[in-house]
UniProtKB/Swiss-Prot annotation:
Disulfide bonds join 284-313, 433-435, 437-450. GO terms for cellular component: collagen-containing extracellular matrix; extracellular space. GO terms for biological process: angiogenesis; blood coagulation; cell differentiation; Tie signaling pathway. Binds to TEK/TIE2, competing for the ANGPT1 binding site, and modulating ANGPT1 signaling. Can induce tyrosine phosphorylation of TEK/TIE2 in the absence of ANGPT1. In the absence of angiogenic inducers, such as VEGF, ANGPT2-mediated loosening of cell-matrix contacts may induce endothelial cell apoptosis with consequent vascular regression. In concert with VEGF, it may facilitate endothelial cell migration and proliferation, thus serving as a permissive angiogenic signal. Involved in the regulation of lymphangiogenesis. Pfam families: ANG-1, Fibrinogen_C. One of its GO terms (molecular function) is receptor tyrosine kinase binding. Residues 1-18 form the signal peptide. The Fibrinogen C-terminal domain mediates interaction with the TEK/TIE2 receptor. NCBIfam families: GGGWT_bact. Keywords: Angiogenesis, Calcium, Coiled coil, Developmental protein, Differentiation, Disulfide bond, Glycoprotein, Metal-binding, Secreted, Signal. Glycans are attached at residues 89, 119, 133, 151, 240, 304. This is Angiopoietin-2. Residues 275-495 form the Fibrinogen C-terminal domain.
């Protein structure tokens, strides 16, 4: 369509150019013919001649003297009329020419436009057909691609869903494993801390053992020097046999004098024993009430029996009347004893001793007793725990301890585990631990799973009493690794 419009405009411009050239030629030259070339066509126009036009030779001089003025005026009017006629003829010819050109050009333009339209229409139809075919082919290809993309998208969505489910499952497993790892790390940290503490304590114990070893080596060296000195003295004594004989004679006289003194002291002892037999009590409270208010060793009888035992009576602490059932003060007595020894008692009542589980069990089951435990550390501090009700079961129940109503300054919590635990020794394991606490911590005691206390443990001297888990300990006063200097356990009737 645009090509047709362009072609029509081109033809109009050509015709206009030809007409302008024709008019210019007529105005400037006055020729009889005019030729127009348009494409393969050539147009020639014949024009009439202007015979009445004045020639240049007939021109007159402008400065001539005008003598016959009227004659010249008529001639000029006539010539003007001729020129006007000529102009009218030329105008008519031009109008005819224009009409002819327009008629011919219209026909040619119509033919050209029809041919152009037909050609363009065929071309456009062919182009449209090709475009439709290409569009159909592209549409088919796009449909195939869309189907492939849809299938691929569906498959990817399924894979994505599967991956999402797998990812969620893995995330849950990772969270569970992370939680387990954190728990294991906490346990590991706790165990590492315990191991480090044990290593530190082990190092301290090794240092203490090393110091004891050095002391023993010094003692052995001293003993070696003493033995050498004794050997020298023995050699000297062997050589000086005569001197020994004289000394033997002197010794015989001394022995005779000693025998005389012993016989005299035996008679005095018999009289003292007879006096003691007259004052026998079931506990120290009865002795106190009878007027004996001096602390010391007294003879006590088992309830409902004539069997006797020696016990130390504290007649000063807290109003007196206390029967001491245990004392630790210098480490002179070994408390790693058998079941039978703890049952009957051992040691000296005036020093370190254990009164005996059987006697304490029988006495505390006759009436209600209180138990007082007095403690002293190596810095001179003292504390106590007082139980308002205390008794021991019989041997049938392993002398199980029973305590109620704790007061005192040695901790707000009882360091003897409750409810009551059975008594254990190195040859009778009655605790609640598979580790045999009596053998690990030494001494007989009411162990739970070893527990927070043991007043019958190993005695450690000053500067060696820390970080000792088998020492004399009372956890809720000094902790589990501090070994005390002195302890006293004593009982008294609750109604005293």
């Amino acid at each position: 369509m645009w090509q047709l419009v362009f072609f029509a405009l081109s033809c109009d411009l050509v015709l206009a150019a030809a007409y302008n050239n024709f008019r210019k030629s007529m105005d400037s030259t006055g020729k009889r013919q005019y030729q127009v070339q348009h494409g393969p066509c050539s147009y020639t126009f014949l024009l009439p001649e202007t015979d009445n036009c004045r020639s240049p030779s007939s021109s007159y001089v402008s400065n001539a003297v005008q003598r016959d003025a009227p004659l010249d005026y008529d001639d000029s009017v006539r010539r003007l009329q001729v020129l006007e006629n000529i102009m009218e003829n030329n105008t008519q010819w031009l109008m005819k020419l224009e009409s002819y050109i327009q008629d011919n050009m219209k026909k040619e333009m119509v033919e050209i436009q029809q041919n152009a339209v037909q050609n363009q229409t065929a071309v456009m139809i062919e182009i449209g057909t090709n475009l439709l075919n290409q569009t159909a082919e592209q549409t088919r290809k796009l449909t195939d691609v869309e189907a492939q993309v849809l299938n691929q998208t569906t498959r990817l969505e399924l894979q994505l869903l599967e991956h999402s489910l797998s990812t969620n499952k893995l995330e849950k497993q990772i969270l569970d494993q992370t939680s387990e790892i954190n728990k294991l790390q906490d346990k590991n940290s706790f165990l590492e801390k315990k191991v480090l503490d044990m290593e530190d304590k082990h190092i301290v114990q090794l240092q203490s053992i090393k110091e004891e070893k050095d002391q023993l080596q010094v003692l052995v060296s001293k003993q070696n020097s003493i033995i050498e000195e004794l050997e020298k003295q023995l050699v000297t004594a062997t050589v000086n046999n005569s001197v020994l004989q004289k000394q033997q004679h002197d010794l015989m006289e001394t022995v005779h004098n000693l025998l005389t003194m012993i016989s005299t002291s035996n008679s005095a002892k018999h009289s003292l024993v007879a006096k003691e037999e007259q004052i026998i009590f079931r506990d120290c409270a009865e002795a106190f009430k009878s007027g004996l208010t001096t602390s010391g060793t007294y003879t006590l009888t088992f309830p409902n029996s004539t069997e006797e035992t020696k016990a130390y009576c504290d007649m000063e602490t807290g109003g007196g009347g206390w029967t001491v059932i245990q004392r630790r003060e210098d480490g002179s007595v070994d408390f790693q004893r058998t079941w039978k020894e703890y049952k009957m008692g051992f040691g000296s009542p005036s020093g370190e001793h254990w009164l005996g589980n059987e006697f304490v069990s029988q006495v505390t089951n006759q009436k209600r007793y209180v138990l007082k435990i007095h403690l002293r550390d190596w810095e001179g501090n003292e504390a106590y725990s007082l139980y308002e009700h205390f008794y021991l079961s019989s041997e049938e129940f392993n002398y199980r301890i029973h305590l109620k109503g704790l007061t005192g300054t040695a901790g707000k919590i009882s360091s003897i585990s409750q409810p009551g635990n059975d008594f254990s020794t190195k040859d009778a394991d009655n605790d609640k631990c598979i580790c045999k606490c009596s053998q690990m911590l030494t001494g007989g005691w009411w162990f739970d799973a070893c527990g927070p206390s043991n007043l019958n443990g190993m005695y450690y001297p000053q500067r060696q009493n820390t970080n000792k888990f088998n020492g004399i300990k009372w956890y809720y006063w000094k902790g589990s690794g501090y070994s005390l200097k002195a302890t006293t356990m004593m009982i008294r009737p609750a109604d005293f």
